[in-house]
């Protein structure tokens, strides 16, 4: 799971949902 995937996921909303994890987009 890399920065590009996180960036693309964070475009969808304030929280990025991936298997077994949640990434708040404020980390970007």
From Swiss-Prot:
Cystine pairings recorded for this chain: none
Subcellular location: Secreted
This protein's UniProt keywords: Disulfide bond, Neurotoxin, Secreted, Toxin
Modifications after synthesis and translation: Contains 2 disulfide bonds.
KW RNA-binding (keyword) present: no
Origin: domain of life: Eukaryota
GO molecular function: toxin activity
Cellular component terms (Gene Ontology): extracellular region
Chief subcellular location: secreted
Tissue expression summary: Expressed by the venom duct.
Entry remark concerning the domains of this protein: The cysteine framework is I (CC-C-C). Alpha5/8 pattern.
Protein name, per record: Conotoxin Cl1.2
Species annotation: Californiconus californicus
High-level lineage: Eukaryota, Metazoa, Spiralia, Lophotrochozoa, Mollusca
């Amino acid at each position: 799971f890399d920065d590009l995937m996180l960036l693309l996921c964070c475009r969808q909303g304030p929280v990025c949902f991936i298997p077994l994890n949640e990434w708040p987009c404020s980390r970007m």
